[in-house]
Amino acid sequence: MAKPTVNVNQAIRAREIRVVGANSEQLGIMPLNEALALAESQQLDLVEVSPTAVPPVCRIMDYGKFKYQQSKKLQEAKKKQSHVVVKEVKLRPKTDEHDLQFKIKHVRRFIEEGNKAKVTLVFRGREITHMEFGVRALERVASEIEDIAVIEMKPKMEGRSMFMIVAPKVKK
């Protein structure tokens, strides 16, 4: 992602600019060299805030402090983003009842934590000839967790395994 470049002091190309003071007061439209002299007299920088406006808007401020605040804002935004993790639970078509309940409990925990869950059913040997056992097992898992989850991807075959992806229900 390219960082937006901000024109500062001599890098500003417009002849006339609208100037905003250090304390957010409007100083009006003035020639660039006059605005640069004003900023220099206050020992601050002239920063182009809105280059697309007519005339461009520039603000008298401490550019180093401005960059620091921008980086802090970016870090805060990154902190607030939620990262979705897909957890996986593997089953077999002949998985015993107690073991299946145990795996379903794992899927429930993943969903309650806010993560997605991938339920994979692995066929071995000749088990693949009886796919209905696998479909039944995945449907059982889906029916057990339908109160807290929604099926994002229906059961689908991929090689010797069948999988489905479930996600937490969106709270209204």
Swiss-Prot record:
Location of the protein in the cell: Cytoplasm
Gene Ontology molecular function: ribosome binding; translation initiation factor activity
Any GO CC annotation of this UniProt entry: cytosol
Keyword Metal-binding found: no
Subunit structure: Monomer.
A biological process term (GO) from this entry: ribosome disassembly
Keyword Chaperone: no
Name the record gives this protein: Translation initiation factor IF-3
Principal location class: cytoplasm
Lineage of producing organism: Bacteria, Pseudomonadati, Thermodesulfobacteriota, Desulfuromonadia, Geobacterales
PROSITE patterns in UniProt: IF3
Annotated source species: Geobacter metallireducens (strain ATCC 53774 / DSM 7210 / GS-15)
Homology family: Belongs to the IF-3 family.
Role: IF-3 binds to the 30S ribosomal subunit and shifts the equilibrium between 70S ribosomes and their 50S and 30S subunits in favor of the free subunits, thus enhancing the availability of 30S subunits on which protein synthesis initiation begins.
Keyword entries, A-Z: Cytoplasm, Initiation factor, Protein biosynthesis
One Pfam family here: IF3_N
